[in-house]
A protein has these predicted regions:
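Short, basic/aromatic-enriched C-terminal tail that caps enzymatic domains
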Residues: 127-145
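Glycine/small-residue-rich loop that forms an oxyanion/phosphate-binding "nest" at active or ligand-binding sites
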Residues: 1-15, 19
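Donor/substrate-binding cores of folate-linked one-carbon enzymes
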Residues: 16-133
Length: 145
């Protein structure tokens, strides 16, 4: 299936693949084929809480903050070079739904910005490291407090 999708995307000559809520694990051949062209947004401050149920995990662990991460996609689940993160507070008595709403508001802001950087040719993946305007980003990307 990934090969057929990859062939189709290659025929279209895509510059960027934008994932949001895509719950399928991409194969290593697919991620390598489109390395530096796949972005994902994940509802946690990666590398903390890869995978599912991030809001619940943050609540269960008594975290005081949560957030969202935009990253390049590689073969690891929610792996890949981090581009930008946004943090949100977790208040006493918060529910999963409240944290999710707060996080989602930030997702809308930062994903748009990162896609803009990519389209403007300002954002690149070089040797598995994210670069913005020719400068390597820190391991956790930029943090938008």
């Amino acid at each position: 299936m990934d090969k057929a999708i990859g062939d189709y995307l290659e025929d279209l000559n895509v510059d960027l693949i934008v994932l949001a809520g895509y719950m399928k694990i991409l194969t290593k051949p697919f991620t390598q084929r489109f390395a530096g062209k796949i972005l994902n947004i994940h509802p946690s401050l990666l590398p903390k809480y890869p995978g599912l149920d991030t809001y619940q995990r943050a609540l269960e662990n008594g975290d005081s903050e949560h957030g969202t991460t935009v990253h390049f996609v590689n073969e690891e689940i929610d792996g890949g070079a981090i581009v930008l993160q946004a943090k949100v507070p977790i208040f006493p008595g918060d529910t999963v739904e409240e944290i999710e709403l707060r996080t989602r508001e930030q997702e809308y802001l930062i994903y748009h910005l990162v896609i803009k950087w990519f389209v403007e040719d300002r954002l690149k993946l070089i040797e598995n490291q994210a670069y913005l305007d020719g400068k390597q980003l820190p391991p956790n990307g930029y943090a938008n407090e």
